[in-house]
Amino acid sequence: MSWFTPEVIDILISIVKAVVILLVVVTCGAFMSFGERRLLGLFQNRYGPNRVGWGGSLQLVADMIKMFFKEDWVPKFSDRVIFTLAPMIAFTSLLLAFAIVPVSPTWAVSDLNIGILFFLMMAGLAVYAVLFAGWSSNNKYSLLGAMRASAQTLSYEVFIGLSLMGVVAQADSFNMQAIVESQAHMWNVIPQFFGFITFAIAGVAVCHRHPFDQPEAEQELADGYHIEYSGMKFGLFFVGEYIGIVTVSALIVTLFFGGWQGPFLPPFVWFALKTAFFMMMFILIRAALPRPRYDQVMSFGWKVCLPLTLLNLLATAAVILYNAQ
């Protein structure tokens, strides 16, 4: 057992931590689909899914079995390779974006010094999945939906990046652990309130969630860029959307609400409670807000979110220069 050195033990522990965290994220994303339907039923004064298992508790299992046994159909004139790769890229990129989020002082998949840049890179990679899905399906409605979805996502990713620059400037680091530790005395949501508002709005848009779900809404363009997908390929898109919600909620907590910091309770409990709160806010937004037109969504981004992020960045720079004197 000469190879069983302390360095090997550290590597094995890191692998176990990474697997546990990512499995929890996937499980949370899957269970959120059931929780969303139950909460929407509560908000709309109806029952929601309550037939499979006690109180509908096995509805998720039934959905997984149904999706697993559905025909994995591929359009005759599609590009089969790209058609198959698209849902894999969508699922993997959104899952890997969570890798830089610290769940506690000692638990994170990867403690990168360029953590925020890694998240932006993974968010950008998800756009390729949308374009691949729309183009490879050889369907005009799918392609139009993909073009609209990618234009919306790329636009709002600009606002996400700019809204994060104020946080980076205050913490003087791209490292997520350093950003959490910089909030020991005051959460970033107070000095970076406009950055938080913009990041939250852009996060909803990047996840293609209501009210920014025009590219894939049932009433718009025949269900959008994944119209030709079925079976587990569609399931990867479906679960990937909810994993995106978990990731954006965790990033809001980490960047603006002190991450795992809090009194009395263990750090990971604080992180889980804060993240669950913002996941519920995603559901509440879907239940409460109407869906605007696509041109209104794009105009709102460039005419409201962009000036707000630039104003926030300018104010942050002025405060930092004033404190440095």
Curated annotation (Swiss-Prot):
GO MF entry, a single one: NADH dehydrogenase activity
Membrane topology classification: Multi-pass membrane protein
Database matches in Pfam families: NADHdh
Family to which the UniProt record says this protein belongs: Belongs to the complex I subunit 1 family.
Transmembrane segments: 11-31, 81-101, 114-134, 149-169, 186-206, 237-257, 265-285, 304-324
Lineage summary: Bacteria, Pseudomonadati, Pseudomonadota, Gammaproteobacteria, Enterobacterales
Protein name (database record): NADH-quinone oxidoreductase subunit H
Subcellular location field: Cell inner membrane
Source species, domain of life: Bacteria
Keyword field: Cell inner membrane, Cell membrane, Membrane, NAD, Quinone, Translocase, Transmembrane, Transmembrane helix, Ubiquinone
Reaction catalysis annotation: a quinone + NADH + 5 H(+)(in) = a quinol + NAD(+) + 4 H(+)(out)
Organism: Serratia proteamaculans (strain 568)
Enzyme class: translocase
